[in-house]
Amino acid sequence: MIIFKKKAILKVLLLVPVFWICSLIFFAATSNDSSQIGSNNDLANKIAEANFHPKAAKQDVIQGFGPPIEPEPVVENNKVEEEEQPGGNLAKPKFMVDPNDPIYKKGDAAQAGELGKAVVVDKTKLSTEEKAKYDKGMLNNAFNQYASDMISVHRTLPTNIDAECKTEKYNENLPRTSVIICFHNEAWSVLLRTVHSVLERTPDHLLEEVVLVDDFSDMDHTKRPLEEYMSQFGGKVKILRMEKREGLIRARLRGAAVATGEVLTYLDSHCECMEGWMEPLLDRIKRDPTTVVCPVIDVIDDNTFEYHHSKAYFTSVGGFDWGLQFNWHSIPERDRKNRTRPIDPVRSPTMAGGLFSIDKKYFEKLGTYDPGFDIWGGENLELSFKIWMCGGTLEIVPCSHVGHVFRKRSPYKWRTGVNVLKRNSIRLAEVWLDDYKTYYYERINNQLGDFGDISSRKKLREDLGCKSFKWYLDNIYPELFVPGESVAKGEVRNSAVQPARCLDCMVGRHEKNRPVGTYQCHGQGGNQYWMLSKDGEIRRDESCVDYAGSDVMVFPCHGMKGNQEWRYNHDTGRLQHAVSQKCLGMTKDGAKLEMVACQYDDPYQHWKFKEYNEAKAIEHGAKPPS
């Protein structure tokens, strides 16, 4: 009898913890308020832990950096004074949004930044503490977080969309899309504004989900506060956590892998979508699943967060230069003639890469992104070439507008030792550019280094039956200047001083209307790589050396000669400006360029291109008399 009682007691002791464990598992499975995907810090487990250890759950009210969490219930006489929630201890998180916090206000016309207006912060009038906060926001984000935190995450945007877009009719049976937003330590107000603009301006029947891909953020507001805030959307917003810092390309691929929508729409984490942005994109894909579409990208000022809306007539299309850098240019005349309305979708040779929609199955058929690409850079051109050369179409849709915060620098830190953009670009060139790859290699002084195995990507191109890059240039981007037509190219060296000085653009590739200077020759190409066209232009891809009577500048090439026409004599080394008849020289210390009267024996007017094709110069009549 005693033995029987002992066995019974033992069974009870064993069954009680088993019962509680099963209960916890059941409640965790049925309380899926935060749609966290593959996370190591599941929200349900955190709430359970907080309830078992109440002191651990204490959290201060957060303003501007995360959602305020409702305070702990008051415990008196071991009794919790709160309304009982279904699901026991695993109750859904509650939110106590501070009504005085400007970022959560909705529908207040007097709110800062409404209708996309600028928020101007006079830093000189801030207290020492507020100045420190202002500076920290700038340092962490490379945009004015202080101004952003004064603007509602629900703010309204300009309503001056093109009138024709307001009456445009779209297919009634459009596919559903997953919107994928990758981020790393994005500012709270900016990230939430991006998400809310998607949720509030996309018809619910078209929005499958929003997938937030966290690329291993380490700021507190991107962790539990973000999970708890997004749980209010009932599974519409999901969070995917990367287990290590992977970069934009791999983060996007992970997002695509879990997305369930028929169409994938990619956005950056510092965007705002305008009303009616989604329907025009999905309509084009509905008509042809091999069409990849981009919205018009409006500029959100990185300092004031003013939304600059552009009209359809001024839509630009994407291009690239032989440094394999993306650029914008106006719609070519040949395409403009084929359009009946300014709001008609327009073909684009390339995409900027941050904002676009693509049929998921078609994306997979194209091989998604090159898995050998690291971090970011070059993926937009790879996808653009692949779309056009392998039977698809790439368009910009003027009735779809999304604002984007364009920063002047990147706030992110990466491991050093490898030029990631260069490595990605070499892989791109090897697979897609055919013999034209030499034009890129000349710009990096033919220093290729280790770019990995590309055999699988070449096989992909072969299996897809893609066209040649020459076909792409002839049919999709005939406006691009081809370096093979150059009379001379490479560095432009002057040896009057030592070390020798080279003509140097001294600005970023996309910066124009800036002075040209000289710098010690470095042999790396880049800012010192120039081309002399058959028309006498000294080109840096789409920029030309221009002289209008004051400084020697780089301006966008206009193809009309004039101030951009130069006559080069390789024998004497003179670069003579056709209009002014002056010659390009430099000061005695080699520090500055100057335009002076031509003198045959002046070594400071003696310039040598690294490569010169005399036969081509004679052929095009580009060789002036000595």
Curated annotation (Swiss-Prot):
Its cofactor is Mn(2+). Substrate binds at residues 215, 245, 269, 376, 407, 412. GO terms for molecular function: carbohydrate binding; metal ion binding; polypeptide N-acetylgalactosaminyltransferase activity. Gene3D superfamilies: 2.80.10.50, Spore Coat Polysaccharide Biosynthesis Protein SpsA, Chain A (3.90.550.10). Pathway: Protein modification; protein glycosylation. It catalyses: L-seryl-[protein] + UDP-N-acetyl-alpha-D-galactosamine = a 3-O-[N-acetyl-alpha-D-galactosaminyl]-L-seryl-[protein] + UDP + H(+); L-threonyl-[protein] + UDP-N-acetyl-alpha-D-galactosamine = a 3-O-[N-acetyl-alpha-D-galactosaminyl]-L-threonyl-[protein] + UDP + H(+). It comes from the Eukaryota. Mn(2+) binds at residues 268, 270, 404. It is an enzyme of class 2 (transferase). Disulfide bonds join 165-399, 390-466, 502-521, 544-557, 583-598. Signal peptide: none annotated. Residues 174-284 are annotated as: Catalytic subdomain A. Its main location: Golgi. Keywords: Disulfide bond, Glycoprotein, Glycosyltransferase, Golgi apparatus, Lectin, Manganese, Membrane, Metal-binding, Signal-anchor, Transferase, Transmembrane, Transmembrane helix. GO terms for cellular component: Golgi apparatus; Golgi membrane. The keyword Membrane applies. Its EC number is 2.4.1.41. It is a single-pass type II membrane protein. InterPro entries: GalNAc-T (IPR045885), Glyco_trans_2-like (IPR001173), Nucleotide-diphossugar_trans (IPR029044), Ricin_B-like_lectins (IPR035992), Ricin_B_lectin (IPR000772). It is found in: Golgi apparatus membrane. There are two conserved domains in the glycosyltransferase region: the N-terminal domain (domain A, also called GT1 motif), which is probably involved in manganese coordination and substrate binding and the C-terminal domain (domain B, also called Gal/GalNAc-T motif), which is probably involved in catalytic reaction and UDP-Gal binding. Catalyzes the initial reaction in O-linked oligosaccharide biosynthesis, the transfer of an N-acetyl-D-galactosamine residue to a serine or threonine residue on the protein receptor. Belongs to the glycosyltransferase 2 family. GalNAc-T subfamily. This is Polypeptide N-acetylgalactosaminyltransferase 5. It comes from Caenorhabditis elegans.
